[in-house]
């Protein structure tokens, strides 16, 4: 959702058409409003993905994100109130990450009413502005096979790759290993058996990718 006007027009057309299908989308947190969300729900929207990134306002500024943590939290709360599921997209290990910002993110993901969380590992891809900031114009090839978003190939000052990996697991577990999340996914699988199969396929695919990444990075 970048333009509320266009989203409103689209939702009204969907409602008027009588088409019966569901859809999901991505959105900025600073463009969403309760009225728009209610209309999106009526038009069939079942999930919105937000690039929340981190629980630290300091890191959000470094990333040139327009929103602050408080605005992100408000958007997620509004979305949940409208009956739409929220997927939070986060990143760990961005330049400036510290143990304190990790704890802020951990507290943030536990606090907001997300239904699914995606945490990626910061990867400075060649050609990107952040890559030039870190390495200059030289292209490194010592960890090329590991630059897939599933491995830490760089660590901020004062942290190590191994420590980032531990924080990565801690953040994910702090969100998913809560009783209410277990109950949520259990009820979802009972209501929609195909969802359980999809989760199993995703889990096996993720495990296979991790094994390949580990073998290639050795």
Can you name each region flagged by the protein language model?
Residues 1:
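Acidic catalytic loop of the alpha/beta-hydrolase fold
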Residues 174-218:
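Membrane-proximal basic amphipathic "stem/tether" segments
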Residues 4, 10-193:
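A structural motif corresponding to the C-terminal lobe/cap of the Radical SAM core domain
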